[in-house]
Amino acid sequence: MASLSRAPQQWATFARVWYLLDGKMQPPGKLAALASVRLQGLHKPVYHQLSDCGDHVVIMNTRHIAFSGNKWEQKVYSSHTGYPGGFKQVTAAQLHRKDPVAIVKLAIYGMLPKNLHRRTLMQRLHLFPDEDIPEDILKNLTEELPQPRKVPRRLDEYTQEEIEAFPRVWSPPEDYRL
């Protein structure tokens, strides 16, 4: 009878969990690092390279990702068709305008292990450019992952009371003119 009581525990351990991750104002590399751990199942104590125990990851707002510095124009994605003269290069800004999901997808694809399980793991990744997620995926969601980076508030999001209560580092003298 002991094996019957352990069966539900084993199914709960290997069950697939659906995680939601918001990509708004987040760097693609940080999203990829967080998602690849969940897709592979590295966060589970029963993880093994040959066991398929990864979870589903749903990432929304991929249209609103953020790069630091001038990476929108400096980062180049390249591909080759295999034919002479088939080498193509496109900047991150051009690729993002064409397909707002592609940058996050390529970042996660690059973070996954380079073996035969890679495409199977990518099938458990669900990317959406905005907050519109289909109803059949929404009902499967079980947990929301915290964003890897804190999103800063814009200046127009502060109230006048918060601005006045903010500590002043320097106060100008009476005869100072702007």
Swiss-Prot record:
| GO biological process terms, semicolon-separated | negative regulation of translation; translation
Per its UniProt record, what Pfam families does this chain match? Ribosomal_L13 (PF00572)
This protein's record includes keyword Transmembrane helix: no
Q: Which keywords accompany this UniProt record? A: Mitochondrion, Ribonucleoprotein, Ribosomal protein
HAMAP family for this protein: Ribosomal_uL13 (MF_01366)
The family note in this entry says: Belongs to the universal ribosomal protein uL13 family.
**Name listed for the protein in its UniProt record:** Large ribosomal subunit protein uL13m
Protein's organism = Bos taurus
